[in-house]
A protein has these predicted regions:
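C-terminal motif of bacterial Sec signal peptides marking the signal peptidase cleavage site
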Residues: 17-18
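Extended, loop-rich substrate-binding clefts of extracytoplasmic carbohydrate-active enzymes
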Residues: 89-167
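Acidic (Asp/Glu-rich), glycine- and aromatic
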Residues: 54-57, 61-64, 165-214, 222-223
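Bacterial N-terminal signal peptides that target proteins for export
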Residues: 1-7
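Beta-strand-rich recognition/accessory modules
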Residues: 265-345
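Beta-strand-rich N-terminal accessory domains
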Residues: 23-90, 188, 326-328, 334-335
């Protein structure tokens, strides 16, 4: 197994995680609907999120995602479109994990909007290995990354560890990608862990934006009514707003007010990950992504990321998603969340 552009990290100390003033863990219940290819995660009887793995879509994902006070933080389109929200990028669904170039196949941009899927891959869940509730719920999922002939490139084993308090939610995602054949993952901006957010978390904008993927396909993000949009990105680099795109961070958070309450959430990298610290691929129109498998594509002076896995070799990637209601999580506390996560797994 060959990694280019690796950063070593020596963990000197691990701080205790003081996420909220209420640290008592809530009970999480798990409801499995095998026929509907869906697993619901309930906190004190209220839906937090659902793991959806129907083959109607090109990948599994978590959708919807609710804050502890019951506000939806994910965009509804393309599953449940809501009035006034954007309808661009139909491959942005809930929270997901994939990449734009694996053996030349694009897993990121694949959706029902793509007619010729020759150069695209898809992810299929083959087995739910565990679905357990409790104070620390656990989902263990086996998936396959396939080409259009259903030939398997990667076998993915993913552990989701979910905890909740009165005013916070945490998802730790540990994913091991095992090469079923020789695999090359190349430097690409389209990745890696992402969530498409509700309108409240977008940046207000009065400009039409045009984005082009590596296939030359363009997506126009039209100007829309920005009323209610007040999202602000911030990260460990000190960058905020649009300036955070393409920068390296230990963590990136997004905060906004929705229906009178402040909600903050974000992604945390792990020092053991290839490409640590990850690059922010966060856009003001509502894509919130962080990418360990892109470097030069974000910053031309950086060395290109190249991950080569011989058949049977594997790559493990670890990320935390943290969500809190009631305040904008300050940078100092985000640092402590990152440090605590760094000492796990």
């Amino acid at each position: 197994m060959i990694f280019k552009h690796l950063t070593l990290f020596s963990l000197v100390s691990v701080m205790l995680l003081g996420c909220t003033c209420n640290t008592n863990l809530s009970e999480i219940t798990v409801a499995c609907d095998e026929a509907g290819s869906q697993i619901d995660l309930m906190v004190d009887g209220n839906l937090f999120t659902s793991f959806r793995y129907t083959t109607d879509y090109e990948k599994p994902f978590l959708y919807p995602i609710y804050s502890p006070d019951g506000q939806m933080i994910t965009r509804g389109f393309p599953i449940d479109p809501r009035p006034g929200e954007r309808t661009d990028h139909p491959h942005h669904i809930g929270m997901w994990f994939n990449h734009g170039n694996v053996n030349g196949l694009d897993f990121w941009n694949n959706s029902s909007a793509i007619q010729d899927k020759t150069n695209y891959g898809h992810i299929v869940v083959t087995k739910i290995l565990e679905a357990k509730g409790g104070k620390r719920a656990h989902l263990k999922v086996l998936s396959e990354w396939r080409d259009q002939a259903e030939v398997v490139l990667l076998e993915e084993t993913t552990d989701y560890y979910i905890t909740a308090t009165l005013d916070s939610r945490t998802i730790d995602r540990v994913s091991t990608l095992k090469a079923i054949q020789d695999v090359i993952i190349t430097d690409n901006k389209e990745g890696l862990i992402a969530v498409r957010v509700d309108k409240a978390f977008e940046k207000p904008s009065n400009e039409t934006q045009v984005f082009t993927d590596e296939h030359g396909n363009t997506t126009v993000v039209e100007v829309q009514d920005s009323s209610g949009a007040n999202g602000m990105y911030y990260g460990s680099s000190g960058k905020t707003g649009d300036d955070i795109w393409g920068t390296r961070n230990d963590w990136v958070m997004l905060s906004a007010e929705k229906d009178g309450n402040v909600i903050s959430f974000g992604f945390f990298d792990h020092p053991s990950n290839v490409g640590y610290p990850f690059h922010s691929h966060a856009r003001g129109y509502g894509l919130f992504a962080c990418n360990n498998l892109g470097a030069k594509v974000f910053n031309p002076v950086e060395e290109e990321i190249l991950v080569t896995l011989a058949k049977g070799e594997s790559l493990t990637l670890k990320h935390r998603f943290y969500l809190e209601t009631g305040s904008k999580v300050p940078a100092e506390r985000a640092d402590s969340i990152f440090t605590a996560f760094s000492g796990k797994y």
